[in-house]
Amino acid sequence: MSQHTQDNQINNNETIEIQETDTVPIETNSLQSGLTSLIPMILIFAVFYFLLLRPQEQRRKEREKLVREVKKGEEVLTNSGIYGIVTKVSENDNNIEIEIAKDVRIKAIKSSIIDITSRKKEVAATQENNKKNKKVICAKSS
C-alpha cells in the first residue's frame, strides 16, 4: 500500500495544469503614465517655440529682406557702427561699397548692414508732412 501511495504522489507531482485564457491582460497604467509624462514636455517645447524660435526666425527674415533690398545712394549703418552712403552694390559676390567721408570708401559684406537709416528719415519726414497738412487743413476749416 505504501508503494501505491508513492506512485500516486509521483503522478500528482508530474501533472501540470494548463489554463486557457481568451485575452492577455494589458497593463494600461504604464501606457497612460507614459503619455501623461510626455504632455509637460510637449507644452514646454510649444512655449519655447512661440516665445523664442518663431520671433527670432521672423527677425532673421526681415533682416534678409533689408539686406537684399539695399540700393545705391542709401544711407546705412553697419554692425561696427559706421554710417555711410552706399556707392556700389555688387550682386555676384555679396559685397557693397560704402562712402564714409569724402573720397573715403570701404568695402563691406551686405550682411554687415544693420539698418538703412535713409528709409527711416523718409518715413519720419512723410509723417511730419502729414501732420503739417492736417494742421493747415484744420486751420483753414476754422
From Swiss-Prot:
SMART domains: YajC. It is found in: Cell inner membrane. Part of the SecDF-YidC-YajC translocase complex. The SecDF-YidC-YajC translocase forms a supercomplex with SecYEG, called the holo-translocon (HTL). The chain crosses the membrane at residues 33-53. It holds the Pfam family YajC. It is a single-pass membrane protein. This is Sec translocon accessory complex subunit YajC. It comes from Rickettsia typhi (strain ATCC VR-144 / Wilmington). Belongs to the YajC family. Residues 1-21 are annotated as: Disordered. The keyword Cell membrane applies. The gene is yajC. GO terms for biological process: protein transport.
